[in-house]
Amino acid sequence: VVDQSADIILEHVGMTFNDQSGILETLKDIHTRIHPEEFLCVLGPSGSGKTTLLRILAGLEQPTQGSVRFPVENPHVGLVFQASNLMPWRSVMDNILLPLDLRGNNHAEALHKANELIELVGLEEFTGAWPDTLSGGMAQRVAIARALIQDPDMLLLDEPFGALDALTREKMGIELLRIWQARRKTVVMVTHSISESLLLADRVLVLSQRPAEIVLDLHVSLERPRGEAARYSRDFQVLSRRLRDAIQ
């Protein structure tokens, strides 16, 4: 019997905004569970409320209908956006340390954690580098390390590789998978890419056009570890077609 007491539960979550043109319903009756250490991808058309859903999970927005229940009070959440949002006047090391500096953590302990994460994301030779000298992929590695330094209960990623070229994006997907397998966090990632979601996720939620509802909750049955070769398997093609058909 699977213990579901540690699940994050979204109970009939809805979100309505009031703007100048009237009432805008973004999310409608989103009902699902997110399991511990699960890698969940959220797919859907542009403007379908994927980012709003992520903001609700992060505690940055309160749903206007329904509720989100966490297994712990005040969960720690790490956030990574499409823009790395690095501080240009801080080095790679100092950007990663920023969340702990703001909390006034013990510096020696913080430095030890940061060094571990720098090794994890493969930036050992760039600890003193400035953000404007980094490639897009390297900047996102720093952003992921910064999000992990507080040892969050959940990592939320909003199209983290959306601004990268196709080849770098593929490499970063494989890197993210390696990091997730090393740290085993609960991950929720918004993406527009069907193949990216199938390479990374345990499960994919497909949202409809606004107001967004879940139109498909797909368990990704592909064996792990998955590499680029997985794209060419018959199972991958079948799942890809199911996702494509579900996205309106």
Regions of interest found by a model, annotated:
Residues 130-134, 138:
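Conserved ABC ATPase signature
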Residues 149-153:
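A short, proline-enriched helix->beta-strand linker immediately N-terminal to the Walker B motif
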